[in-house]
Design a protein with these regions (language model features):
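Beta-propeller domains with acidic blade repeats across secreted/periplasmic ectodomains
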Residues: 18-385
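Positively charged n-region of N-terminal signal peptides that target proteins for export
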Residues: 1-5
Length: 385
């Protein structure tokens, strides 16, 4: 019996299931030739589709281009932006972009495919000049509200003499700090133009997204106060763990680091998902719900999450437990030609997944790729409970 068992096990091991690339076709998309000539200019930090099928793409040096996927032709829509990190298309002539100093609406008034008007939707937050004060987003809910998230500053660099907004030195030069409002927060812009500080406690919340029911999620990157990278269900007024942002919470007094950890932990809302550091993700990015209704594979309603350090896209399945969310994470597409720096994603009209790559001087790569399901069902773990 023993030799037969050994032979049987060897036979099973030799029939290992196919890699994910057997079920999804990966394609690298050529970028604008004028950007390809400039070092690091082809970092893609925002993607969305127009109703007419064009792709809107923002690049790290401040350009927004549109791509006609049928012809492969690129056209410059706008430039002069400051490190744009996301796009929401409103219609065939308008889009909203998050750039470092503001959330901006770009409008093509005459229909020639070039933005004529730049409108500030919100600049109701502080800027100290620290390099790490990113502005992530936006995303838009069914009621027309926009949400965006602000990164904290890094002790790896200081602040500028001229700042925007009030300066609070109580957290200055902590590992990651929020010396101006509302660093480490998610903010909401209402349809009538009000900016509302929505939730606090984030370190580097590089990625916002909704599930199919309209619940808002944000990822956060590992570091001080964030033992491993996480994904949170964002709700108004909640605090999610990074203490620096508490300086701008109404009624807060004193230096957050001087408060006992049990006191801070008592007001913290726990994450929905933890990404094991190194094994799963070091720098998770945008969560994107599979809204294709099964046309991208058997994962409808689950979330795909990018990762900067690896050539990996993760998959997250959530469930409701005692009024909150908890979930599992698993690698979805790992290696097999996928670049690192998977910073922004969007589903196209043909239900393929478009992926923008970036590095910002750290881990990652540059470029634009897309994944297309070939209709074969992969041998994968679908969900847990």
């Amino acid at each position: 019996m023993r030799p037969l068992a050994q032979i049987f096990l060897i036979g099973i091991s030799s029939l290992s299931y196919a890699g994910i690339e057997e079920y999804y076709e990966l394609e690298t998309v050529p970028l604008p030739t004028e950007l390809a000539k400039v070092a690091n200019a082809t970092q893609v930090d925002g993607l969305d589709f127009f109703p007419d099928g064009r792709l809107a793409t923002c690049f790290v040096d401040g350009q927004v281009y549109t791509l006609n996927p049928k012809t492969g032709n690129w056209k410059l829509f706008a430039d002069g932006l400051h490190e744009p990190l996301g796009i929401v298309v409103l219609n065939n002539r308008e889009m909203v972009v998050c750039q470092r100093p503001e959330v901006t609406k770009l409008r093509d008034n005459d229909g020639d495919g070039v933005a004529d008007e730049f409108e500030v939707l919100s600049d109701a937050f502080g800027i100290s000049g620290n390099y790490h004060e990113f502005n992530f987003g936006p995303v838009r809910d069914a009621e027309g509200n926009f949400y965006f998230s602000l990164g904290t500053a890094s002790s790896g660099a200081g602040v500028r003499y001229e700042k925007r907004g009030p300066f609070n030195p109580l957290s200055y030069m902590d590992r990651m700090y929020a010396c101006v409002p509302y660093r480490g927060w998610v903010l909401k812009i209402t349809p009538d133009g009000k900016t509302i500080p929505w939730a606090s406690g984030f370190r580097t919340p590089n990625g916002l997204g909704f599930d199919l029911e309209g619940h808002l999620f944000v990822t956060d990157n590992q570091g001080d106060w964030v033992g491993t990278s996480k994904m949170h269900h964002v709700q108004q007024g909640k605090f999610y763990g990074h203490a620096g942002s508490l300086l701008w919470r109404e009624g807060w007094e004193g230096r957050p680091l001087n408060r006992p950890v049990p006191e801070l932990d008592a007001i913290r809302t726990k994450a929905a998902v933890l990404f094991p550091h190194g094994a799963m993700a070091n720098s998770p990015t945008q969560p994107l719900v599979d809204s294709t209704g099964g046309k991208f594979g058997p994962f409808a309603g689950q979330l795909f999450v990018g990762e900067m350090n690896k050539g990996r896209i993760m998959r997250v399945a959530l469930e409701r437990v005692r009024g909150g969310f908890q979930g599992m994470c698993i690698p979805f597409y790992d290696g097999a030609g996928l670049k690192r720096g998977n910073n922004r994603m969007v589903f196209g009209p043909d239900h393929s997944l478009w992926i923008g790559h970036s590095n910002h001087g750290w881990a990652g790569e540059r470029g634009l790729q897309k994944l297309r399901w070939n209709k074969k069902v992969p041998f994968e773990l679908k969900s847990m409970s």
